[in-house]
Amino acid sequence: GEELCQEVSKMGITLPHPERTWFGEPEAKRRQEFLNQASEFELDSPFHQSPNETKAECLWRRYGEEAFELLEMIRQDFSLSEPLFPEAENLLCEIHLIAKKEMIVSLADLLRRRTRLALLFHHDFLKNSKNLKEAASIIFGKQTENQWSEYF
């Protein structure tokens, strides 16, 4: 919300009560606390496709307060700070959080709505991604093969 207010203000539009906290958006000091902690895990570098936003900023934008859970996962297993695959803008810890918090009904739901991977990568690339299949197994468990064959 704050970023939106800044952009709208740049257009010369005066906002009533721009200092108000947006619904659901944590205070700026919580964001800064997250960014400080995230830098300990080398999340202050950008994804290669998004040079204007660090991994930490991206995680905060996507998850808000829940991003602290991602840091805790990384604290317990640093390998979860790695991207799903080098070209992806989703970290392995996100897959674990998605599996824990969201009701993913299909592989299409995961690839189109939750991660946007289907919108960013060729179908065959995704189909042949071992890492993606492993991520799907975290979410779908015993239903992974059914989900995989249904989507691909």
Features from the language model and the residues they span:
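C-terminal accessory subdomains/tails of enzymes that are appended
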Residues: 1-152
